[in-house]
Amino acid sequence: MVLQRIKIPKLLVKPVGRAIADFSMIRDGDRVLLAVSGGKDSLSLFHILRHFQRHAPINFDLGVVTIDPEVEGFEPQALESFFQRFETPYFFEEFPIMEQAKQSMKGDSYCSFCARIKRGLMYQVARRENYNVLALGQHLDDLAESLMMSMCHNGKIQTMKAHYVNDAKDIRIIRPLVYVRERQLASFAQELKLPVIADSCPACFSMPTEREHFKQWLLSEEQRTPNLYKNLLSAMKPMLDEVND
């Protein structure tokens, strides 16, 4: 696969470019570490960020990190060779997250525990390799689902941030896909035949998640209200930026 031959659809370039500009996500001289699980979202974001490396009026470095939770069925070997073809720095970290969860998890969901452990490991890699920005692949559907979960279960109107700083104040976290729909990414990944790794988390298979429940509810509601996600984005936008408030 040759980068110059990959055409990124305007339906992806425009919303990602607008999000990067709206929230000042990437600045000249930044070193951006992209978290890649092997899913369609993060792999698509890799190509989009490479596009902006070539065409944006700023210069930034791009590296990739994968956290292997050491669960049966997760086979990330194809990712290393994939990123080698683009001469992209690739960092691979292993950690027995499920085993750790059995010993240490208290009053939390597996998904929340796993996300917290992975985030800590990614911060370690970013510091060790001198990256100041961590890019994550959540999209508009994810933000809408988080909003509904927070309102219904916690009584709070909040969702994931598009841009914020970690507690240690040394790494900025960005989500360039906040204006992009999941189905757009699925179509792009399929068209490019990206080496997508299927979700193999046993916790997700053993119990339906609340996120999946709200995902299906929102998609069903969208059939009745075609502008649903556009309206939800308008409602969420004031709460998405922590860095530039």
Q: What positions do the PLM features span?
A:
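Short C-terminal domain-edge/linker segments immediately following a structured domain
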Residues: 92-98, 124, 164-169, 207-210, ...
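Hydrophobic helical membrane-anchoring modules
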Residues: 241-245
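Catalytic subdomain that performs nucleotidyl-dependent activation
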Residues: 141-220
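Electropositive phosphate-/nucleotide-binding environments in soluble metabolic enzymes
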Residues: 6, 10, 73, 116, ...
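An accessory alpha-helical subdomain
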Residues: 217-240
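ATP-dependent adenylation/nucleotidyltransferase module used to activate substrates
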Residues: 2-147, 153, 183-191
